[in-house]
């Protein structure tokens, strides 16, 4: 059973408490099941959580770090905020507000992928991948265009309350984002009728879930979202990764594939005991996509080794079948699941850390695509 995080006197997670998250539980699982078999441990974990490399290995201090502050020359301010959920706990976040742009501003809420993540969607600061802060970059690009942006620490991460995010189902995560939307609608600086959502990976599935229920959502961006259940994603990842093993016979490859599929089935069989895992395995994004009526931009890297690139078109087609006439798909060449430029795309921790030695920024192509599209649908 996952351990509930300890709280400090003010009800915020202690920065010194290291809790057993989904990562530690799965690490123990793959060791027991011998799922590795020539596969790096980091890749095995990625088969289970599509953006696990972002996971924060330790809690951020309750006092927001200075790196959440904008550059002094930026044409926007950054305000530390607290968003109260319907369950009464507070989510810590940063609200960037443009300067010298007409008010009230259009606004966007950013939605993180799976696994415990801070508001920048960065990993542990001690880990080199911590230099990769995609949500800070997206917030900067949008606020420089006159769009307010709210990004929040996941529940139980950083300065946010709410217990362990690993125990939250996908619909429960959506409720946290809805709290952020309500918060924006109550800000005088924000136009309540011009609010959009941008989500990556699992966050890309949460955005449509909210938009299908809330007609006030003006537009959504889906980054590397899936079009099938978590079970299907896991099986695809295993097949994809096994096919890339070099120096083995077809017979040996089949044996490895069978062993890995058996391990995945065991992992899935335990889903009833872990709320997030159960919702991940069962949730079908296509059923939601059919009911999304607002404008949608779907982005996917053609080197994504976590979610098949074809899923971008599957989502778009389902939305169009449901009557949505404003769905745009853009496949970015040589972009991986992190939306970094990468001609290979295969996931290993070593590969990604080496990649980040050369680039830790989202591509200009991606940032321009997002900011232009959001501006045209919210600000123009």
Regions inferred by a protein language model and the residue ranges of each:
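Catalytic active-site module of serine/aspartate enzymes centered on a nucleophile-bearing elbow/loop
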Residues: 338, 345-380
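Accessory cap/linker subdomain of secreted extracellular hydrolases
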Residues: 123, 210, 219-291
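N-terminal cap/lid segment of alpha/beta-hydrolase-fold proteins
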Residues: 64-103
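Short beta-strand/loop motif that positions the catalytic acidic residue
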Residues: 292, 298-300, 304
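Short alpha-helix in the alpha/beta-hydrolase fold that links the catalytic acid
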Residues: 294, 308-318
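Short, surface-exposed "cap/lid" segments of acyl-processing enzymes
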Residues: 101-103, 108-141
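Primarily recognizes the serine-hydrolase "nucleophile elbow" in alpha/beta-hydrolase
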Residues: 179-241
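Alpha/beta-hydrolase active-site loop
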Residues: 134, 166-188
């Amino acid at each position: 059973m996952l351990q509930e995080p300890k709280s400090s006197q003010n009800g915020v997670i202690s920065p010194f408490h290291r809790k057993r998250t989904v990562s530690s539980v799965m690490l123990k699982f793959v060791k027991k099941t011998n799922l590795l078999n020539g596969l790096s441990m980091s890749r095995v974990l990625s088969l289970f959580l599509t953006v696990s490399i972002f996971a924060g290995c330790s809690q951020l201090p309750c006092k927001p770090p200075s790196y959440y502050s904008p550059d002094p020359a930026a044409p926007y301010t950054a305000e530390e905020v607290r968003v109260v959920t319907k369950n009464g706990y507070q989510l810590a976040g940063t609200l960037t507000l443009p300067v010298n742009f007409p008010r009230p501003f259009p606004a966007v809420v950013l939605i993180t992928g799976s696994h415990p993540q801070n508001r920048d969607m960065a990993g542990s600061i001690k880990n080199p991948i911590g230099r990769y802060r995609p949500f800070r970059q997206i917030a900067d690009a949008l606020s420089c265009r006159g769009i307010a942006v709210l990004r929040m620490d996941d529940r139980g991460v950083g300065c946010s309350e709410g217990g362990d995010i690993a125990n939250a189902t996908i619909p429960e995560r959506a409720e946290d984002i809805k709290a952020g939307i309500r918060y924006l609608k109550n800000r005088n600086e924000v136009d309540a009728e011009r609010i959009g959502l941008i989500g990556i990976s699992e966050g890309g599935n949460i955005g449509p879930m909210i938009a299908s229920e809330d007609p006030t959502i003006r537009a959504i961006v889906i980054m590397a979202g899936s079009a099938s259940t978590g079970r299907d994603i896991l099986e695809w990842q295993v097949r994809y990764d096994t096919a890339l093993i070099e120096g083995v016979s077809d017979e040996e490859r089949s044996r490895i594939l069978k062993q890995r599929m058996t391990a995945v089935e065991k992992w899935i069989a335990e889903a009833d005991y872990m709320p997030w895992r159960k919702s991940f395995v069962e949730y079908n994004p296509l059923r939601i996509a059919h009911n999304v009526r607002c404008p949608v931009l779907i982005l996917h890297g053609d080197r994504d080794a976590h979610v098949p690139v074809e899923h971008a078109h599957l989502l778009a087609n389902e939305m169009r079948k449901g009557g949505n006439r404003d769905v745009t798909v853009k496949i970015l060449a040589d972009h991986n699941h992190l939306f970094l430029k990468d001609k290979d795309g295969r996931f290993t921790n070593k590969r990604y850390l080496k990649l980040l030695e050369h680039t830790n920024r989202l591509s200009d192509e991606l940032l321009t695509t997002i900011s232009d599209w959001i501006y045209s649908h919210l600000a123009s």
